From Swiss-Prot:
Chief location category: mitochondrion
Name assigned to this protein: ATP synthase subunit g 2, mitochondrial
Complex formation: F-type ATPases have 2 components, CF(1) - the catalytic core - and CF(0) - the membrane proton channel. CF(0) seems to have nine subunits: a, b, c, d, e, f, g, F6 and 8 (or A6L).
Subcellular location, record wording: Mitochondrion membrane
Keywords assigned: ATP synthesis, CF(0), Hydrogen ion transport, Ion transport, Membrane, Mitochondrion, Transport
Molecular-function GO term, any one: proton transmembrane transporter activity
Physiological role: Mitochondrial membrane ATP synthase (F(1)F(0) ATP synthase or Complex V) produces ATP from ADP in the presence of a proton gradient across the membrane which is generated by electron transport complexes of the respiratory chain. F-type ATPases consist of two structural domains, F(1) - containing the extramembraneous catalytic core, and F(0) - containing the membrane proton channel, linked together by a central stalk and a peripheral stalk. During catalysis, ATP synthesis in the catalytic domain of F(1) is coupled via a rotary mechanism of the central stalk subunits to proton translocation.
Designated gene of the protein: ATP5MGL
Species for this entry: Homo sapiens
Cited Pfam families: ATP-synt_G
Amino acid sequence: MAPFVRNLVEKTPALVNAAVTYLKPRLAAFWYYTTVELVPPTPAEIPRAIQSLKKIVSSAQTGSFKQLTVKEALLNGLVATEVSTWFYVREITGKRGIIG
């Protein structure tokens, strides 16, 4: 056991340096996208969101969603799946459990 621990202690600085070197550009990109994408909407963006929601409701009422191409329908389905998945993940996180 002692040789294992000694070997691990000797290699730890090299492993940490490798991890920092590997993660530094990725964390910079991650931080950039979190500051850009996770900001709350500005007051100027709210009317566009309402207009988009009205357009979705209108297409559901008139049946114009049937004229979508397969690619557009697939992309819309993937976006809806992603939104609902993140909603449920956040609900589970907020409740601190799956049940209850």
